[in-house]
Amino acid sequence: MEVIAENRKARFEYFILEEFEAGMVLLSSEVKSLRERKVNISDAYVVEKNSEVWLHNMHIAEYKAANRKNHKPKRERKLLLHKKEINKLIGQIKTAGITVVPLSVYFNDKGFAKTKIAIVKGKKLYDKRATIKQREWDREKSRLSKNNL
């Protein structure tokens, strides 16, 4: 599994409730840009439309060599999931305070572009502070243990 892009902001901003692996409907120029790692998913989110799930606001840069057949960088991309997973996501999207965001984009072992999406709930400011405090304490513990050896 070759990770192309990771949404580190999502892991800090949200509590992750459940994760799914989804395929994406992409154009050939988009796949070539993904192979060059020219993608940004930090502002992306998932929306339900006509009983399908769509990925919005994911930026895949235009591929230089594809002149006329190029794609729009921020176009909507359809996500490929099983029907049960789609129904579960749609139910969660309609719940207040819950959203679905991509966590990472990668190529699987067969060479297909996949995205890991998650059902998330927003953190409050004090939750973010607690996360920072815990991270700093873990770093301090590792420093102390290295110095004692």
Curated annotation (Swiss-Prot):
CDD domains: SmpB. Keywords: Cytoplasm, RNA-binding. It is found in: Cytoplasm. InterPro entries: SmpB (IPR023620), SsrA-bd_prot (IPR000037). Its main location: cytoplasm. Pfam families: SmpB. One of its GO terms (cellular component) is cytosol. Transmembrane segments: none annotated. GO terms for biological process: trans-translation. One of its GO terms (molecular function) is RNA binding. Required for rescue of stalled ribosomes mediated by trans-translation. Binds to transfer-messenger RNA (tmRNA), required for stable association of tmRNA with ribosomes. tmRNA and SmpB together mimic tRNA shape, replacing the anticodon stem-loop with SmpB. tmRNA is encoded by the ssrA gene; the 2 termini fold to resemble tRNA(Ala) and it encodes a 'tag peptide', a short internal open reading frame. During trans-translation Ala-aminoacylated tmRNA acts like a tRNA, entering the A-site of stalled ribosomes, displacing the stalled mRNA. Belongs to the SmpB family. NCBIfam families: PRK05422.1, smpB. This is SsrA-binding protein. It comes from Wolbachia sp. subsp. Drosophila simulans (strain wRi). The lineage of its organism: Bacteria, Pseudomonadati, Pseudomonadota, Alphaproteobacteria, Rickettsiales. The gene is smpB.
